[in-house]
Amino acid sequence: MMSKHIFQKEPVLSIATCLAIISAFFVPPDAEYLGYIDFRTLAILFSLMTVMAGLRGQGVFDRLGHALLSHTRTTLQLTAVLVGLCFFSSMLITNDVSLLTFVPFTFVVLNSLNASVRSKLLLPIVCMQTIAANLGSMLTPLGNPQNLYLYGKSGMDMSAFVLLMLPYSIISLVLIAIWAVWLCREGSAIVVTHSAVNSEPDKKLIALYGILFVACLLVVLRVLPYGVAFAAILVCAFFADRPTLGRVDYSLILTFVALFIFIGNLGRIEAFSGWLQNVLAGHEVFVSVLASQVTSNVPAAILLSGFTDNFRALIIGTNLGGLGTLIASMASLISYRQIANEVPAEKGHYFAMFTISNVVFLAILMGAWAMT
């Protein structure tokens, strides 16, 4: 019964752990296992999640949302703010944190509107917030876990990474803008009422996390050793804001560890290694998009990176592959759970809307890739 509960709560971690254990029967544990683990990626991931949890705990992102909403007067402006927050913020705070913050915020804001406007906007906005967070996050190495991993693995510099994904980000932004105008084609004036964030933020903590975020950026840019930033963030959080350490997504870190072990073992099984290298050769984008649909894009990135050096193609493929099925990007489940909890009668409608919208966006972006 407990194992079923764990699987339902953490399906990706559960599957990754099972795969790691099964692979250990074919490649018994030895000293080489330690070499599988990318400690730099894990340290940066922990550091970023801790800093984001700290800033979120201080209501920084909620206050940003409230400030922007104070200028909205129409449904189009409201939609642009709520969806734009997810698109642009995900570039720096990750798609997960963006959705964890702004989807609940959206429920609060829309609840202040009349029932007809709320019912018209709720599902489309949450659906597009999810797509926007996934697509906005693809522009930077900080945007999502697979980017962070592949950026470190590839040895690319920041500018090369951004330039690689910039065309897809621009196309995505244009598509989202067109969608917003279409949704609000019968736009009407609205009055948004929303309660201010109650608790006063700790300005010293916000300043501290701001400094620590800069440290994270310096690590990503390979200016600062990851061990220094990791130690500083761990010590600062432990002594200055200990509850934040409890809000870190440790299951994601453990998922990475399990996948590192699984991929490391597969690489030592010659028959499988040779087969996958042949499948990938020249088809990295297409294969990574397909793999993301069934495993989600983080496991797909880690799996495929062990069998090709074409990291540019993997970066494109796993980012575009975050579109499509509900599990293509695990961040998408955050929004789905919010819908299922808040308006359970609408979750089927949301799922259909989400799937159709994702397939359309994926088809257009894959078409753009095919023309490059």
Feature roles, as predicted:
Residues M2, H66, L183-G210, F239-G246:
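Flexible interhelical linker loops that connect adjacent transmembrane helices
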Residues S3-K9, A31-T41, M156-Y168, N198-K203, ...:
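Interfacial loop-to-helix junctions that mark the boundaries of transmembrane helices
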Residues K9-S14, F39-R40, H66-T79, L121-I131, ...:
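Cytoplasmic-side transmembrane-helix entry/capping segments in multi-pass membrane proteins
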Residues Y36, Q58, D62-G65, I211-D309:
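Transmembrane helical segments that form the transport core of multi-pass membrane transport proteins
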Residues F39-T41, S70-V83, L113-I125, K203-A207, ...:
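Membrane-interfacial loop-to-helix junctions in multi-pass transporters
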Residues F88-M138, I302-I315, P344-H349, N358, ...:
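Hydrophobic transmembrane alpha-helices that form the pore/transport pathway of multi-pass ion
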Residues V117-C184, I190-H194, Y336-L365:
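Membrane-core helix-loop-helix motifs of multi-pass transport proteins
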Residues V162-L173, F286-T372:
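C-terminal transmembrane helix pair
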